[in-house]
Amino acid sequence: MAGPQQQPPYLHLAELTASQFLEIWKHFDADGNGYIEGKELENFFQELEKARKGSGMMSKSDNFGEKMKEFMQKYDKNSDGKIEMAELAQILPTEENFLLCFRQHVGSSAEFMEAWRKYDTDRSGYIEANELKGFLSDLLKKANRPYDEPKLQEYTQTILRMFDLNGDGKLGLSEMSRLLPVQENFLLKFQGMKLTSEEFNAIFTFYDKDGSGYIDENELDALLKDLYEKNKKEMNIQQLTTYRKSVMSLAEAGKLYRKDLEIVLCSEPPM
């Protein structure tokens, strides 16, 4: 964590590499919660103004609040009062804007789940470094972006450092889903409703009436509704349709197996 006197790195540069962007992010997201907010946000805005003007320390002028408000209206796309990583990528001149490149490839939660299914080749519930590298390679090809092996390696390591919250060198589904725009990230809706393995097994067994080891989309509908009602949360038909479509992207021929649903609903991916 950066000390209060440490100068923010790289804000003055005309273009940032992926690694430099990450250093800026880690400097200002001091508590590591995935957002720049509150005092962190004020500090970021002041330092950004200072870097852009090339002036001395900025004093808090009368119009600081108004300038901050305009800044947030421009860049806080989902109006939650916080800056997330992809919003920061819009503010700073990031080289080849690799985060936006991701989002063009997995623009919806259903596409994201399909990509997850493709690259979680061993069905472990994680994408490991070698699998992530393949994911990024395909991504860059789709976007017609030239790259060499060192650049691909840099992107792989940078994405790991960005999203690998527990530092184990691999990305779980909830970590990887932070690549999605917040409004598309249906997995965020399940935060606070994560099940233990015992709870998950009980609810899956209840809906898998014939003990086949999988459920279909109608049974998934009922399961999701049940989960929301038990947690006293509301879900409309449109949300239910979106969540079902996203989760069913993990299914095989309309069959959603226990292990795949467990990745979405459990606190920890299956062992």
From Swiss-Prot:
SUPFAM superfamilies hit by this protein: EF-hand
Has keyword Repeat? Answer: yes
| Database matches in InterPro entries | CALB2, Calbindin_Ca-bind, EF-hand-dom_pair, EF_Hand_1_Ca_BS, EF_hand_dom
Amino-acid positions noted as binding Ca(2+) 1 in the UniProt annotation, renumbered to this chain:
29, 31, 33, 35, 40
| Gene Ontology molecular function terms on file | calcium ion binding; calcium ion binding involved in regulation of presynaptic cytosolic calcium ion concentration
The source's superkingdom equals Eukaryota
Q: Which residues bind Ca(2+) 2?
A: 76, 78, 80, 82, 87
GO biological process terms held by the UniProt record: intracellular calcium ion homeostasis; regulation of synaptic plasticity; synaptic signaling
Q: Which spans of this chain does the record mark as coiled coil?
A: none
Residues annotated to bind Ca(2+) 3? 120, 122, 124, 126, 131
What's the family? Belongs to the calbindin family.
Q: Which PANTHER family match?
A: CALBINDIN (PTHR19972), CALRETININ (PTHR19972:SF4)
Q: What is this protein called?
A: Calretinin
Species whose genome carries this gene: Rattus norvegicus (Rat)
